[in-house]
Amino acid sequence: MKFQLHRTDGLARRGTLSLTHGVVETPAFMPVGTYGAVKTMSPADLQVINAHIVLGNTFHLWLRPGLQVIEAHGGLHRFMGWDGPILTDSGGFQVFSLGVLRKITEQGVKFKSPVNGDTCFLTPEESMRIQYVLNSDIVMIFDECTPYPADERAVGESMELSLRWAERSRQAHDEGGNRNGLFGIVQGGMYEKLRDESLAGLLDIGFDGYAIGGLSVGEPKADMRRILRHTAPGLPAGKPRYLMGVGTPADIVDAVAQGMDMFDCVLPTRNARNGWLYTRTGVIKLRNSQYRLDTRPADEQCTCYTCRHFSRAYLHHLQRTGEILGARLNTLHNLYYYQQLMGEIRTAIENGQFQEYAQAFQAQTAS
């Protein structure tokens, strides 16, 4: 894995991330393919919208279809028919989401499988082994996603456990012979001091890239931005920086301004299935009756397949009748919008005009 930083504009960064299965231009947005598929999208669709990299989920793929199936295909790329780069989350967030169904110990996490009720045990070593079989281009360490809200003592204990797991993840990754990139994850909740301690510990271990985790878990937007502004400047300048699970287009523009390079979020695909379309002037909610006779495309400035061929009225009709095509067309549009956004951001940074772009973007989407 190799990261090249080409240009900065303020704190915003323009780079190139060279991975085993291809090159990712940064800043980049990664569509989420939890089970090895971005919902309603084929790999060919993802290429058309210019997605450079997709995200898969270690936890869910481990449970279903299981490692035996994926290993028989030689890894996740061939299994899902995608020949570009893949980043896999370690499973820490999904285990966190199980709540009372899981028990955390120093060794790892014991939980009941949401698929069949079997007792499962996931450790840093097992997470690294799974991701080695998946052959993901970027592997995430196994960590504990700190719940929100939580007091400083509880968050501190969680962060320290994640650091110990980070060291075990690094060791297992290296001893297993995995040559793909391994990213550390900064935790520490809403406490700047704990975030600093987490980052210092990760830097001592040493990783190929660094992520900010534990945000977008229910905290107020102001707290998310406060922690981002505090943590991002301390991340190594020569390594890729990944903000996990964030977010809206406005969140991404704001995070790029703080120096972040990589993003993932389910919002564009989930909202598409619910009839919410992102446009240059804000969000369209297709179920609203105001679109019943609207012959305009969803976004008159958009050149995606959906906007070139279909009206808001037709998309409204598909949403109202529950047609599967509606979810597909909406997803095509939203992911195209996100990829176009990232392309515009990259161009603005290259031209030294990112601040002006960000101001114009925020003004336009707020109007």
From Swiss-Prot:
Binding of Zn(2+), residues: 302, 304, 307, 333
InterPro entries for this protein: ArchSynthase1/Queuine_TRR (IPR050076), TGT (IPR004803), TGT-like_sf (IPR036511), tRNA_ribo_trans-like (IPR002616)
Catalysed reactions, semicolon-separated: 7-aminomethyl-7-carbaguanine + guanosine(34) in tRNA = 7-aminomethyl-7-carbaguanosine(34) in tRNA + guanine
Cofactor binding mode and count: Binds 1 zinc ion per subunit.
The keyword Zinc belongs to this UniProt entry's keyword annotation: yes
Pfam families: TGT
Residue numbers annotated as active site: 89, 264
EC number: 2.4.2.29
Any one biological process term the GO annotation gives: tRNA-guanine transglycosylation
Top-level taxon of origin: Bacteria
Record region (RNA binding): 245-251, 269-273
Enzyme superclass (EC): transferase
GO cellular component: cytosol
Assembly: Homodimer. Within each dimer, one monomer is responsible for RNA recognition and catalysis, while the other monomer binds to the replacement base PreQ1.
Family: Belongs to the queuine tRNA-ribosyltransferase family.
Role according to the record: Catalyzes the base-exchange of a guanine (G) residue with the queuine precursor 7-aminomethyl-7-deazaguanine (PreQ1) at position 34 (anticodon wobble position) in tRNAs with GU(N) anticodons (tRNA-Asp, -Asn, -His and -Tyr). Catalysis occurs through a double-displacement mechanism. The nucleophile active site attacks the C1' of nucleotide 34 to detach the guanine base from the RNA, forming a covalent enzyme-RNA intermediate. The proton acceptor active site deprotonates the incoming PreQ1, allowing a nucleophilic attack on the C1' of the ribose to form the product.
Record-given protein name: Queuine tRNA-ribosyltransferase
Organism of provenance: Nitrosospira multiformis (strain ATCC 25196 / NCIMB 11849 / C 71)
